[in-house]
Amino acid sequence: MSLCTVEINLSTIKNNYLLLQDVCKTSLVGAAVKANGYGLGAVQISKALIEENCRHFFVASSEEGVNLRNALGLDVNILVLNGVFEHDALELIEYNLTPVLNNLKQIEIWQKFSNLKNRLLPCYLHFNTGINRLGLSSDEIEQLINDRDLLKGLDLQYIISHLAISEEIDNPYNLEQLNRFKAYLQYFPNVKASLANSGGIFLGQDYHFDLARPGAALYGLNPLTKNPVTLKAPIIHLQNLTLDSHIGYNMTFTTKRDSVIATLPLGYADGFSRNFSNQGEVFINSRSVPIVGRVSMDLINIDVTDLPPSEIFLGQEAEIIGNYCTPDKIASIIGTIGYEVLTNLGSRYKRKYIG
């Protein structure tokens, strides 16, 4: 078992959810728990949010949906964002999973199984309004508008779209997407709608519609919500090195003084990027400590020379992620995003849930 521990504060996640619910006021708020709850534990997070009356959970695939359904029971809505495919349609039906249909082919597949089961099957439709990943194209939407038989046999519960740049409040593309979405919705006046992701929630009430779908903001990846994650690693080795000693693979760091170097038991096999080599930092008792040398598969070295001697000992814990080094702050060091930091948290870490 790993010596490193990821601590997830479920109370913080619930408080983040309540903050988002307060912003949305009259709209429902669901939760994106895909990628195992952004690496933090989809089952544990979903169970915590159910306590706050969250009833809509978004996953990427049928496999994620089945795992969540087995853990949560039937009293919640589980939506599969990647939609339905021939190979998993029966599984979606068996586990009462609702696909988000992204193209006419997926609509055709879901209709086929509706006929096979001789009953209406629930679905969401995803209209592409400009992010250009998934979603029905404008031509496909026009076909649906002109031929409602294309939706025969389907229980259309929501029409959704996804914002491309919602974290930039003043970007005009947000309004372009909103207006495009509203124009499509005019042809489906009795269907509920969902547009806002985490950033979209803070763009204003016009973006909220009937259901918001935050992910990142639940996990503290937003300036207005709090970080619920702490990753700590103990010092497992200490050594005193003289001036001009080389550290790690390829000798990329050379000491410029007599130094005290500590080793921590995590590395790129645990999702801690090699890009942190010679430029990342950890914290010990609120003091910043630099990473020196290459990040290797299972180990990193840190320079603890400037710490008080009383704080340098085997077993002393270093904070890799926490209040001093949030996922977003860490990500900025290596030019990525906090989402990637969280979803890369390795399976070898012990996970501890509090709150």
From Swiss-Prot:
Record key words, sorted: Isomerase, Pyridoxal phosphate
Active site: 34, 249
InterPro entries named among the record's database cross-references: Ala_racemase (IPR000821), Ala_racemase/Decarboxylase_C (IPR009006), Ala_racemase_C (IPR011079), Ala_racemase_N (IPR001608), Ala_racemase_pyridoxalP-BS (IPR020622), PLP-binding_barrel (IPR029066)
SMART domains, alphabetized: Ala_racemase_C
Residues bound to substrate: 133, 297
Cofactor(s) required, per the database record: pyridoxal 5'-phosphate
Modified residues (N6-(pyridoxal phosphate)lysine): 34
GO molecular function: alanine racemase activity; pyridoxal phosphate binding
Pathway(s) per entry: Amino-acid biosynthesis; D-alanine biosynthesis; D-alanine from L-alanine: step 1/1
Gene3D superfamilies: Alanine racemase, Lyase, Ornithine Decarboxylase, Chain A, domain 1
EC number(s) recorded for this UniProt protein: 5.1.1.1
UniProt keyword annotation of Ribosomal protein present: no
Enzyme class: isomerase
GO terms classed as biological process: D-alanine biosynthetic process
Catalytic activity: L-alanine = D-alanine
Organism superkingdom: Bacteria
Keyword Isomerase part of the UniProt annotation: yes
Any GO CC annotation of this UniProt entry: cytosol
Database matches in CDD domains: PLPDE_III_AR
Name listed for the protein in its UniProt record: Alanine racemase
Species the sequence originates in: Rickettsia peacockii (strain Rustic)
Gene: alr
